[in-house]
């Protein structure tokens, strides 16, 4: 390899690295209340053990930039913290529409395993899937190709809490865990729309590497 060719490669790599640094990829993080969305937001900013957060997010907060570094790769993403109560679901739509979100993370925990009568996740998931797969926005405006996400991921959070309580059966892979069962139909709906889905387990509060690996996998694989 000539000196000039080597120099050109270095310049190209520098340009790509700079682009990744300044060009933020829009992520949408949604889910029922108290599932860990705010904790995830803190984790993406601080990378480390996140202290207990007792304050609930009210409405839609301003989106902020976060730099994710994992396995020698670096990406800048932008996400907003949004409340999970049903009264704020319309603001999920506002966030998706205004920022043209490219990747969506829908966070769940184990509450539906603890109590089959708890439908917090299922109701929020149905609303989200119906919104994404619809050809029009709630205001009647028809969606464009860029309005659909590149992928939707279900993150089963608090694995450090429920992992031992609800262990995998012998020979069962993590993506077949019962925690994902209520969301299979919605995932098929997204797939039928041409939107890939991705299951992931995470402990947003205590395991930053799981968080950063999940983000990087979404960007690289989808």
Describe each model-derived feature in a short phrase.
Residues 1-29, 216:
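Short, flexible boundary segments at extreme N-termini or domain junctions of P-loop NTPases and their
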Residues 26-49:
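Glycine-rich phosphate-binding P-loop
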Residues 35-36, 85-87, 110-115, 159-163, ...:
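Short acidic, S/G/P-rich loop/turn micro-motifs used as interaction or catalytic elements
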Residues 45-78, 86-89:
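Switch I (effector-binding) loop of TRAFAC-class P-loop GTPase G-domains
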Residues 89-133:
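Inter-motif core of Ras-like GTPase G domains
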Residues 103-106, 136-160, 191-201:
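Conserved beta-strand/loop subsegment of P-loop NTPase cores
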Residues 118-140, 170-186:
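Well-ordered, non-membrane alpha-helical segments in soluble/globular domains
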Residues 161-222:
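Canonical P-loop GTPase G-domain recognition
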